[in-house]
């Protein structure tokens, strides 16, 4: 992932950044997957295939969460502008999807963050709080979020 500073929410350090290298992300994802109870749709088999098949024009970012320096949460976020009711434009952050109908034909079931099983009760709420803080209460706004150098 590239540049900037991570913020701490509760006991977590949360950061958002670009995918640096596919092998690096894969190794981190598989390590966390071994410590989580995620569904197939949070597995590297699913996420890795998704990333490998995305066109270069679809940027995805990696949300990473650390607790005491240990990686305890991962997710892909993509920014997309959607049109609702044919007239309302809304910016969205899509979790483990792109936001483009033609690319998200296979929609994941049981979609969620990949979370270390020791943090399933507290980590998702901390991520939501972090995202809401980054949004700064602006409805419909996509945050310009800080990014980090490492997973």
Feature annotation, model-predicted:
Residues 1-151:
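N-acyltransferase acceptor-side catalytic subdomain
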């Amino acid at each position: 992932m590239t540049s900037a500073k991570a913020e701490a929410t509760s006991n977590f350090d949360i950061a958002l950044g670009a995918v640096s290298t596919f092998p690096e992300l894969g190794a981190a994802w598989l390590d966390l997957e071994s410590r989580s109870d995620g569904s197939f749709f949070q597995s590297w088999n699913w996420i890795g295939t998704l990333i490998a098949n995305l066109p270069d024009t679809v940027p995805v970012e990696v949300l990473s969460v650390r607790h005491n320096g240990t990686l305890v949460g991962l997710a892909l976020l993509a920014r997309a502008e959607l049109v609702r009711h044919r007239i309302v434009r809304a910016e969205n952050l899509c979790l483990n999807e792109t936001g483009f109908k033609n690319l998200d034909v296979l929609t994941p079931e049981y979609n969620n963050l990949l979370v270390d099983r020791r943090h399933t009760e507290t980590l998702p709420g901390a991520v939501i709080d972090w995202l809401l803080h980054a949004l700064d209460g602006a409805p419909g706004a996509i945050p310009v979020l800080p990014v980090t150098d490492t997973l």
